[in-house]
Swiss-Prot record:
GO biological process, alphabetically ordered: signaling
Protein name in UniProt: Uncharacterized FCP1 homology domain-containing protein C1271.03c
InterPro entries, per database record: FCP1_dom, HAD-like_sf, HAD_sf, TIM50
One Pfam family linked to the record: NIF
Organism this protein belongs to: Schizosaccharomyces pombe (strain 972 / ATCC 24843)
One GO CC term, this protein: nucleolus
Length: 244
């Protein structure tokens, strides 16, 4: 059964107020979020080969360039360590890989040996991230929390304990490098992150104004929609926190 948000978490997500500085942590999933591993047959060897040569989601280069320039970044993947390293080498340059403040894999999910080697449902516990990681991309101390942490992932179930820190993107599926579907999600995530960058409580923002792609609408229309969400957020926070 998927974990549920704690009462404390839900309470803290209900207020516009939160962190005292603007530093934010972006946690990245890999497969299905930033890339696709096209597999005809699933085996240890085929998964590794697909990890070495994944199909990048459209807009990935610009997305990575933006987040590394503006946020502290870590990876949290349910894949095995050697596959995670293969995917990172395929999509990130050396500077970006070195800039990661952490890279968590299946090893960090507290699985039994039986579970580790099988395709079982896994969960990404952000409480563990907040307990163990206490520095930003420059090495300075910071208290990461629900106020300043954003996870970009295609699985709502894996992020069920912290739904209002989750930018839920659709599962990216592509058949081959020559057959990549049109996809605007990462471009839209950049716009959403630009709005989240300076808010004091990202969990309030995501709770009240969750990320959403308008189906069958253009990139321009979707960016306009996300800007309208931000305007609505600003109006609500002015009501919650009237200026003297």
């Amino acid at each position: 059964m998927a974990p549920e948000p704690s009462l404390t978490y839900l309470s803290q997500a209900s207020s516009c107020n939160g962190a005292t500085d603007n530093r934010k942590l972006v946690i990245l999933d890999l497969n299905g979020t930033l890339l696709c591993r096209a597999l005809a047959v699933r085996s240890e060897k085929s998964v590794y080969e697909a990890s070495r040569n994944p199909i990048p989601r459209p807009g990935l280069h610009n997305f990575l360039k933006y987040i590394f320039a503006n946020f502290s970044v870590m990876v949290f993947s349910s894949s095995k360590p050697h596959n995670v390293q293969a995917m990172l080498s395929a999509i990130m340059n050396e500077e970006q890989k070195k800039a990661l403040i952490a890279c968590w894999t299946r090893v960090d999910m507290k699985l039994t040996k039986h579970q580790f080697d099988r395709k079982v449902q896994t969960y990404k516990n952000l409480d563990t991230v907040w307990e163990k990681i206490h520095h930003d991309s420059t090495g300075k101390p910071v208290s990461w929390s629900q106020y300043n942490t954003i996870i970009v992932d295609d699985s709502k179930t894996k992020c069920a304990a912290h739904p209002y820190n989750h930018i839920a993107v659709s599962d990216f599926v592509a058949k081959s490098h020559s057959n990549i579907p049109k996809d605007i999600e990462l471009a839209c995530v950049i716009r959403y992150l630009k709005h989240l960058k300076s808010v004091p409580n990202v969990s309030y923002y995501i709770y009240k104004f969750p990320f959403k792609i308008l189906a069958d609408k253009s990139l321009e229309d979707n960016l306009k929609y996300l800007d309208e969400l931000d305007e609505n957020y600003k109006k609500e926070c002015q009501v919650d926190n009237p200026q003297p």
